[in-house]
Amino acid sequence: MMINVQTVAVIGSGTMGAGIAEVAASHGHQVLLYDISAEALTRAIDGIHARLNSRVTRGKLTAETCERTLKRLIPVTDIHALAAADLVIEAASERLEVKKALFAQLAEVCPPQTLLTTNTSSISITAIAAEIKNPERVAGLHFFNPAPVMKLVEVVSGLATAAEVVEQLCELTLSWGKQPVRCHSTPGFIVNRVARPYYSEAWRALEEQVAAPEVIDAALRDGAGFPMGPLELTDLIGQDVNFAVTCSVFNAFWQERRFLPSLVQQELVIGGRLGKKSGLGVYDWRAEREAVVGLEAVSDSFSPMKVEKKSDGVTEIDDVLLIETQGETAQALAIRLARPVVVIDKMAGKVVTIAAAAVNPDSATRKAIYYLQQQGKTVLQIADYPGMLIWRTVAMIINEALDALQKGVASEQDIDTAMRLGVNYPYGPLAWGAQLGWQRILRLLENLQHHYGEERYRPCSLLRQRALLESGYES
């Protein structure tokens, strides 16, 4: 089924369809850009023209190359014109029934050797291909927005997809300057599945009134190295879009609790507070937001303090124990240890987050803050919360990545590549897990599961296996 792809058809002239068309045309392909609306096609091509002209102005592209690229774009409103395509990339409605009907029509219009692909972010490739002729030529080709900029493409195989089709799509997207990753058709594929905890744990913290949205975002962004905080990111994506993907994955996994949608996010969607595009979401985008600056400097003088670093993430500051989070509350630790306890959530960067036991004397908590500020840290304080913000979120992402790996969704390398390039995580989750330590991640999730009594935090069996191997190597 290997064919020479010269003509590419793109179905849908919205943001994603236009972006994919621009990519294909920029790499020498004649592109048939299809939409039922001639006006939408005009807007799409005008937008591509404007983007290419901007690159010419900035010296990134020659005027001649710009002109040649635009000449390769052919707007079409008759689906029968797509019979000339070697590859079709559908980027239209994210509804299964619409896609099934469209692909059935494409299977009749296009020759048997034409590769039929969909840019869906989460819909089953197997379901789309199930009732059409030659289902072995159907695959997922999931670009990320904006398509001309983002490197990642998920190449998704359904149950019937031929191996040579996947191979050819990987080679083609590589020639377009993209980084393909291979995965099997499961809900959310790689990125939209493994990324769900980044959003869901932020919503849970907001629901439990652990901290203000800007503190939650600052902790993950400035304390763990994520490019954006989870709540501001949902505002940028669009609350309706992000919520719909979460609901899709949740229902596709038979209401698996790890993917439980948020009632707070649902309220925003119902209320039309969709984020940046509507002006209101988690944040008010009509007004300038103030930066999170951390706690005020503690003016008390606690010097000289006796500081002793114990094993396993414990620092003793006079009578106060500063303990790196392992999934227990500060209150539980303080009562068990009969000492003032401040739990710290830190991973990378200057920002650290703390939570203090309610039984602590105020001076004990202030002493811990003073110590951290003297180390040059920006300190954020949240309510006493097991697993805190950073470690809980990262542990859940790693657990989900391990579950996807164990179930054969994709290779370890492709999962890590997908999360680094698709959502710009500072590390691939599986490499991150090895760096942080499997035993600590397992212990944290077990403590969370015990605290909540929920299956949401159950560690996957591959995490248990890796933690066991790690303990064996260390003994």
UniProtKB/Swiss-Prot annotation:
Cross-referenced Pfam families: 3HCDH, 3HCDH_N, 3HCDH_RFF
Keyword ATP-binding: no
EC number: 1.1.1.-
SUPFAM superfamilies in the cross-refs: 6-phosphogluconate dehydrogenase C-terminal domain-like (SSF48179), NAD(P)-binding Rossmann-fold domains (SSF51735)
Top class in the EC scheme: oxidoreductase
GO molecular function, one term: NAD+ binding
Inducing stimuli: Activated by cAMP receptor protein (CRP), integration host factor (IHF) and by phenylacetyl-coenzyme A (PA-CoA) that prevents PaaX from binding its target sequences. Inhibited by PaaX.
Annotated GO biological process: fatty acid beta-oxidation; phenylacetate catabolic process
Keyword Oxidoreductase among record annotations: yes
Keywords: NAD, Oxidoreductase
Catalytic activity line of the entry: (3S)-3-hydroxyadipyl-CoA + NAD(+) = 3-oxoadipyl-CoA + NADH + H(+)
Pathway where it operates: Aromatic compound metabolism; phenylacetate degradation
PROSITE patterns per record: 3HCDH
Effect of a null allele: Mutants accumulate 3-hydroxyadipate and are unable to use phenylacetate as a carbon source.
NCBIfam families the UniProt entry points to: PaaC-3OHAcCoADH
Function in brief: Catalyzes the oxidation of 3-hydroxyadipyl-CoA to yield 3-oxoadipyl-CoA.
Subunit structure as annotated in this protein's UniProt entry: Homotrimer.
PANTHER family with a match to the protein in the record: 3-HYDROXYACYL-COA DEHYDROGENASE FAMILY PROTEIN (PTHR48075), 3-HYDROXYBUTYRYL-COA DEHYDROGENASE (PTHR48075:SF5)
Family stated for the protein in its record: Belongs to the 3-hydroxyacyl-CoA dehydrogenase family.
Protein name: 3-hydroxyadipyl-CoA dehydrogenase
